[in-house]
Amino acid sequence: LMPIARQQLARESDASEIVFIDDALESVAEVNAHRAMNYLAFLNETASEKYVQIAIANSHVREKIAQRLKMDGIQLWSIIADNVVLMDQHELAEGSALSPFVTIGSNVRIGKCFQANLYSYVEHDCVIGDFVTFAPGVKCNGNIHIHDHAYIGAGAMIKQGTPDQPLVIGGGAIVGMGAVVTKSV
């Protein structure tokens, strides 16, 4: 996600430094031409504001890190690729990561730390919970409710629900890659 973060800072004319955080590091190193450090070193960095994009697929680990960041007064950072399409009346909570070629339809509500990988879309009137992960190429059609911590595998297609009976993907559900979901799970 670093290239997307760099694009976003450039688009916003923001000169903030991007650093990579990895608790396995014992000393400052370099990753993809950026300084890399453990979380304690990051906390000790001097900055007027600090934001973190949690680029970890495991939703429960993401949630734990988000809670720790909140306790430490560090804000979640949403990053959005240059070519993402955002339609009317959408709500995107903090900490989301929208990769290239993602589309978010109209009247969509998305919870915090949502990850939408390459070529995924969320169509109209969907509600996506917190810490949901879309692998590449997920097709989430209209009137679908996806609860917290669901994982939707690469190329999965979810059939459109109706306004009075949305299709529901339950909390913590795992939809396998290439799946075609026609009923609530």
Q: Residue spans of the language-model regions?
A:
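Intrinsically disordered, low-complexity boundary segments flanking structured domains
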Residues: 6-7, 22-26, 65-66, 142-145
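Conserved acidic residues
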Residues: 18, 50-51, 94, 112
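Phosphate-bearing ligand-interacting subdomains
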Residues: 25-85
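Structural signal for interior beta-strand "rungs" in well-ordered beta-sheet cores
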Residues: 79-185
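Alpha-helix termini
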Residues: 7-13, 44
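Glycine-rich adenosine-cofactor-binding loop
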Residues: 1-5
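NAD(P)-binding Rossmann-fold cofactor-contacting core
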Residues: 11-29
